[in-house]
UniProtKB/Swiss-Prot annotation:
Residues 149-257 form the CBM21 domain. GO terms for cellular component: cytosol; protein phosphatase type 1 complex. This is Protein phosphatase 1 regulatory subunit 3C. PANTHER family: PROTEIN PHOSPHATASE 1 REGULATORY SUBUNIT, PROTEIN PHOSPHATASE 1 REGULATORY SUBUNIT 3C. It comes from Bos taurus (Bovine). The keyword Cytoplasm does not apply. Ubiquitinated by NHLRC1/malin in a EPM2A/laforin-dependent manner.
């Protein structure tokens, strides 16, 4: 479009022969709005039509009718009939089983009184049985360390620990390592040495090192019934280098005696006429000299030495 045509659109007044671009700019600035509006009106109509088309609502992708129908299907039906229980006899039919209940008559009080008297007579005739049990009749050999060490050096074998749990006797034996081939046995009797059994001991690995001594363990099951008049004794035999070394508790043997538990909880040993042996007197505390020549009381220095229950926590003796 030329400058002349542009000025005629903006201002219909007659123009001079020559029109410069400056004239067009002046006419644009000074021209009234109606001619400019009439010039831009086609673009406004086009923009208005497109804006209307853009504001049209989109169609929803959700089907509201189907959701409403699904909710109606889940609603509980109130038109269903309620369930009722009807007995067969009400319709003239026979029942499967008939139970008749009646009130129990109350027992008179005087009957209860006689029942209590009978119960009292029965309880008065009952007697608590006295329980008989077995216990060790010797102290733990390792409790007195000095005596244990002297006994071990003298006999080359010594009972170290012993315990009695229910009907099983368990313990350990310490022997000198005199040869590679060796055997340790427990000789035990349950009938006052009319017969005896030799039970082999098992070798225990020395976890503390050292080769001067070895340790053996044993476990002996006692018979279920042992008459109280019979002696239960045992001793230790050690076989090495073609010789046999004995530990018989200085000639007294290691004894297991019967004890009696009274109903009041008192523990007493069986009488001498009922049992063929009596309890040995407790050993007296003696002063013994150590290797350094100073006398010491073993029971005072070692009141709680290693016992069978503490074997896993303390080192073995040398």
């Amino acid at each position: 479009m030329s400058c002349t045509r542009m000025i005629q659109v903006l201002d219909p007044r007659p123009l001079t022969s020559s029109v410069m671009p400056v004239d067009v700019a002046v006419r644009l600035c000074l021209a009234h709005s109606p001619p400019l509006k009439s010039f831009l009106s086609p673009y406004d109509d086009f923009q208005r039509r497109n804006f209307v088309n853009k504001l049209k609502p989109l169609k929803s992708c959700l089907n509201i009718k189907q959701e409403a129908r699904a909710q109606d299907d889940w609603k509980p039906s109130h038109n269903q009939a309620k369930k009722r229980v009807v007995f067969a006899d009400s319709k003239g039919l026979s029942l499967t089983a008939i139970h008749v209940f009646s009130d129990l008559p109350e027992e008179p009080v005087w009957d209860l009184q006689f029942d209590l008297l009978d119960l009292n007579d029965i309880s008065s005739g009952l007697k608590l049985h006295e329980e008989k049990n077995l216990i060790l009749d010797f102290p733990q050999p390792s409790a007195d360390y000095l005596s244990f060490r002297n006994h071990f050096q003298k006999n080359s074998v010594c009972l170290e620990n012993c315990s009695l749990q229910e009907r099983t006797v368990t313990g350990t034996v310490k022997v000198k390592n005199m040869s590679f081939e060796k055997k340790v046995q427990i000789r035990i009797t349950f009938d006052s040495w009319q017969s005896y059994n030799d039970v082999d001991c098992a070798y225990m690995k020395n976890v503390y090192g050292g080769s001067e001594s070895d340790t053996f363990s044993f476990a002996i099951d006692l018979p279920s019934v042992i008459p109280t008049k019979e002696k239960i004794e045992f001793c230790v035999a050690y076989h090495a280098n073609g010789q046999v070394f004995w530990d018989n508790n200085e000639g007294q043997n290691y004894r297991i005696v019967h004890v009696q538990w009274k109903p009041d909880g008192v523990q007493t040993q069986m009488a001498a006429q009922d049992c063929a042996f009596h309890q040995a007197p407790p050993p007296k505390a003696e002063l013994e000299s150590t290797v350094f020549g100073s006398p010491r009381l073993a029971s005072g220095l070692f009141p709680e030495w290693q016992s069978w229950g503490r074997m896993e926590n303390l080192a073995s003796y040398r």
